[in-house]
A protein has these predicted regions:
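Residue-register detector that marks a fixed positional context within folded domains
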Residues: 1-155
């Protein structure tokens, strides 16, 4: 669980707008999905460049996969956001990647050792736009917080 010192820096460090309330969980609470109206978020998701409020495309991704945003690994967010940026640059900023285009290159894959958690695997090596990934952070689920309300959903 994150300390209060870390909690106080979340808004500034991860550029979370002040109108999106965040809080730490109690001593025995876990960052599960679907057990509360509020949404659990992992610190590592923001280190992978996920930002709030979510873009419409990020929300569409979670809805299409029928997942909560915290069921997508930080490296999967890194792949999706990296592809989103590269796709826009390769198209002169005139075309945003669509889910169909993304899923032509990648497919969601369940992580066997982590129930309900998914990542993206390239369908072919040459279709992998984001190839430089940090080492696997097996402790990424240990630092989390909750977001209240609905202001985080879409910008």
């Amino acid at each position: 669980m994150m300390s209060d010192k870390v909690f106080k820096t979340l808004h500034a460090r991860f550029q979370i707008p002040d109108n999106i309330p965040i809080y730490l969980l109690g001593k025995f609470e876990k960052c599960y999905t679907g057990k509360t109206a509020d949404v659990g978020m992992y610190n590592a998701m923001f280190a992978a460049r996920l930002r709030l409020p979510l873009t419409t495309l990020h929300r569409q991704l979670a809805n299409f996969l029928r997942l909560f945003v915290n069921q997508i690994t930080p490296n999967a967010w890194r792949i999706f956001i990296g592809d989103e940026i590269l796709w826009g640059r390769l198209n002169g900023g005139n075309h945003q990647i669509t889910l169909d285009e993304f899923f032509w290159c990648y497919h969601p894959q369940h992580i066997v050792s982590s129930q309900g958690i998914y990542h993206f695997s390239a369908r072919k090596k040459e279709l992998r736009l984001v190839s430089d990934m940090p080492d696997c952070n097996r402790n990424w689920k240990g630092r989390y917080f909750f977001i209240k309300g609905m202001n985080w959903v879409c910008r």
